[in-house]
């Protein structure tokens, strides 16, 4: 194992540690427990969107796995069934855990896990972006801390916007924009964003076209 690889691994572990500390400081940490649903239901005496997201997941998990459309939530809604996408229940997580529904407790929730993973990735991508401009690990940590504590992020937690907490998807798009064009990575990120929230898909699409324009400009005007 090369020294550079060890150094990079230690840096990433440091970011994960920082993200975990801020996750615990911000949420208390207990939301990651799969059987903890109390935080989703009125613990703040405020009606948020979390209740809707969880209830939609309960209906979806009890529908057939092989159905068409895949994310159709036939039992959810009044008379006219809806789609899991419309209830902001993070489709990529829902379809993953639906495959194991027979092994999950009734009060199972994946939203806490999603938030924790989002904290880690929210800290990682700013670090990777800033590393393209400076070799300072301290500056990278400060940059990650800024994005982890940004009010625009923590605001989503307060109002129960779990899917929109995945703002790291936008940062990942910026990271791809700053690197060499790779169509496969853009397709993967676009697909992922669509399985999290349509808003992210729209933003990633704009970044993708910006990348195409930038790449085309470098071909037409190679000396710019």
What are these regions (language model features)?
Residues 22-122, 150-152, 161-166:
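Membrane-interface coil-to-helix junctions
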Residues 116-129, 138-178, 183-215:
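Membrane-embedded helix bundles of polyisoprenyl
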Residues 8-15, 112, 140, 182, ...:
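Residue-level signature of transmembrane alpha-helical entry/exit and packing/kink sites
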Residues 1-6:
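Short, Lys/Arg-rich, polar N-terminal cytosolic tail immediately upstream
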Residues 10-19, 215-224:
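Hydrophobic alpha-helical membrane-interfacial segments at the cytosolic entry of transmembrane helices
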Residues 27, 102, 212, 216-219:
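Transmembrane helix-loop junctions and nearby membrane-interface residues
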């Amino acid at each position: 194992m090369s020294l550079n690889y060890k150094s990079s691994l230690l840096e990433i572990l440091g970011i994960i540690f920082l993200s975990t500390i801020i996750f615990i400081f911000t949420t208390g940490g207990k939301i990651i427990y799969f059987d903890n649903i109390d935080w989703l239901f009125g613990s703040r005496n405020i009606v948020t969107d979390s209740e809707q997201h969880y209830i939609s997941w309960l209906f979806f998990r009890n529908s057939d796995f092989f159905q068409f459309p895949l994310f159709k939530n036939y039992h959810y809604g009044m008379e006219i069934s809806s789609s899991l996408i419309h209830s902001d229940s993070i489709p990529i997580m829902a379809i993953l855990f639906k495959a194991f529904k027979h092994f999950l407790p009734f009060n199972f929730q994946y939203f806490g896990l999603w938030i924790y993973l989002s904290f880690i990735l929210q800290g990682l991508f700013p670090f990777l972006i800033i590393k393209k401009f400076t070799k300072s690990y301290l500056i990278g940590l400060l940059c990650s801390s800024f994005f982890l504590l940004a009010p625009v992020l923590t605001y989503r937690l307060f109002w129960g916007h779990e899917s929109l907490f995945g703002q790291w998807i936008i940062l990942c798009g910026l990271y791809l924009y700053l690197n060499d064009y790779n169509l496969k990575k853009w397709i993967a990120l676009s697909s992922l964003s669509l399985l999290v929230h349509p808003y992210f898909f729209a933003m990633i699409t704009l970044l993708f076209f910006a990348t195409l324009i930038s790449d085309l400009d470098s071909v037409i005007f190679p000396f710019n």
